[in-house]
């Protein structure tokens, strides 16, 4: 029988990406979290702010971690608005597909951008690369260069 998530024996998909076992397009990395582009974006530049700690639901995380993730999400959102000329940055916490605390942060032009049925499930890799590069550049311009990985 497989170990449960809470026992920490079987790593989540996000833990495997963070460890480098699975590739990811990282745009932020610090001691508590990473941010990377999703492979099914609602809009170009859609990022996931992912806790390094394996916590399933955000309501189970400690307050300091939740606060840190929100601060990082705010920086990512501001960079998305700049990089993609978006009027707003949206944020969602769902957690149904991967049982590992993560926030969806994406440039938004309207309420339809919050509908996961509108996600692009087959984006061109070159488009994802370009979006990651644009977001990294905006984060560096905002003064976060020390937290922005090269890829």
Q: Which residues does each predicted region cover?
A:
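HIT superfamily nucleotide-processing domains
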Residues: 1-151
